[in-house]
Amino acid sequence: MITRAEILEKTKEVIYESVPELEGVELREDTVINTDTAIDSMGFTLVICRLEAAFDVRIPNRQWQRLSTLGDVVDAIEKRLTR
């Protein structure tokens, strides 16, 4: 089973690959995705879609608006992986 730390690292990799402008920016679990980073709503949609593909999970669209921090995103992925 994948650990939370592994989910976090893979999530960061996907974000850095999806948003090259974030190169050199430290992403922590408390990083607010839409305000602390250069990710706009379209970029956020791209990141979530790529994360769903990377982890082979589906995060319902209605839950996306509740994903504020990197930790929230990791929580959502972790929850889906343990189902």
Residue ranges and their predicted role:
Residues 71-80:
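C-terminal structural segments of small proteins and small subunits
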Residues 1-24, 80-83:
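Thiotemplate assembly-line natural product biosynthesis machinery
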Residues 18-38, 54-66:
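Phosphopantetheine carrier-protein modules
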Residues 10, 69-72:
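Charged catalytic carboxylate motif
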Residues 43:
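Two-component histidine kinase catalytic core, primarily the HATPase_c
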